[in-house]
Amino acid sequence: MTQPAYIIGAYGYTAQLVAAKMAESNLEFIAVGRDQSNLAQVQQRFANCVGLIVADCQHAAEIDFVAKGALVVNCAGPFNLFAPELISRCVAVGAHYIDITGEQEIVRHSYEHHAALALQNEVCVVHSMAFESALTDLLISRALLKTDRKALTAVNSYYKLGSQQMSPGTKLTMKLANFAPNYIVQDQRLQPLLQQMAEVPQDLPFDAARIVPYPEVIFAFERLKPQRAASHFVLEPDSNLAFAGNFAKMGTNNSAQQEAIVQRFKNVQHVGPDAAARSAQDFELYVSLLCADKNYVEAIRGHNMYEITAALVVLAVQHFAAQPTHFGVLSPGQFLGQKGLDWLSNNPYFQFISLKSN
């Protein structure tokens, strides 16, 4: 891959962090979005922005710029609503696709509808190259090295987040969370998320957790076919995110209602956390793989979740530049492979927590 990547939604909060991180690595991009003036501001701000395209990526007629061999970095969520047409175009013409989604249904949809053609056309579709789900998937890859590939009984992730400051895109995604199905894995099948209270976690330094629907559950199902899998927020008195939202509802795919929510949201100015606030965003992440009677745990503690997302996207773009050799709909851990494991062990954002596995 020698041509610049397309950043979709380039004037969004996280997209601009990605653009800045790409500049640090001398990676060029073309800014894509619906608003000409906002795109012009991006091009003025970032010397590594080498072009702009005004397009609404929900409409097939406006995305014919995506051609064979291109790399599309999609930062325009909510992805359940805005990404399907773009993904279909990428897979059909032979363009690679990355996004930063934290939504399950668009990921499940790609596995069901695009996996075969993506493999045939030698395309990589990599969802959730972000703090949510990519870190968990990489930690799963690391834990798998210790399991001798034994059959997995359960795969669980637990987030303890010290701040509830969110980007505008994350806020909007949460408002639309129940317009699509949410999932856990139960009895080796994807099942609707109907109950958020979880079992008491074992071998972990907290007592309660609440299920929240992150894409890592879909990745775990597709990669490993465990008997059970779920993602969680830790429930502790000092956790600002103990409320965890209400996701235990059946999906109601009402496009008109979603569009109305999006429009109302856009009519209000939203500001994401500034650099100081991002740096102060502390977190802990625990990943548990239960094989027979042994529990393999990987855990990290760190800060700056949005910067982690930007760093992961750049890592993925660099990996594409080196020409991928595995194709299809891939989880972040599958796509990055050893490069991702090396990055886990050498980055400025987090450190491993030592825990005993039983």
Each predicted region: which residue ranges?
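Short alpha-helices
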Residues: 126-140, 144, 316
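N-terminal Rossmann NAD(P)H-binding glycine-rich loop of SDR-like oxidoreductase domains
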Residues: 5-25
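NAD(P)H-binding glycine-rich loop region in Rossmannoid oxidoreductase-like domains
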Residues: 37-38, 42-109
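N-terminal Rossmann-fold cofactor-binding loop
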Residues: 32-36
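Short beta-strand element of Class I
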Residues: 28-30
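C-terminal catalytic/substrate-binding lobe primarily of soluble NAD(P)-dependent oxidoreductases
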Residues: 15, 145-358
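Rossmann-fold NAD(P)-binding glycine/threonine-rich loop
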Residues: 101-123
